[in-house]
Amino acid sequence: METQKLVSMISEALEKYQYPLSAKNIKAVIQKEHNVILPVGSINSILYSYTELFEKIDKTNTIYPPLWIRKN
């Protein structure tokens, strides 16, 4: 998968869900909504490369309700 396409999917997920998402949540959202399988570490490597995306994710260990409960 192209890096730019994955970056746009991450940006889309961060905009769509207005609550804090961790890297693991972002991977789950992208895999479910786009029906793709992502390699291990692909989301983390992109988040570390793009600081504007990295600043938006949740870096705490806070436990949030499941995604389907929080959906807009």
Curated annotation (Swiss-Prot):
What triggers or suppresses the expression of this protein?
A: Expressed in the early phase of the viral replicative cycle.
- Coarse class of the protein's main subcellular location: virion
Q: Which UniProt keywords apply?
A: Virion
| Cellular component terms (Gene Ontology) | virion component
List where in the cell it is found: Virion
Superkingdom is: Viruses
UniProt family annotation: Belongs to the asfivirus I73R family.
Q: What is this protein called?
A: Uncharacterized protein I73R
User: What does the organism's lineage look like at the top?
Assistant: Viruses, Varidnaviria, Bamfordvirae, Nucleocytoviricota, Pokkesviricetes
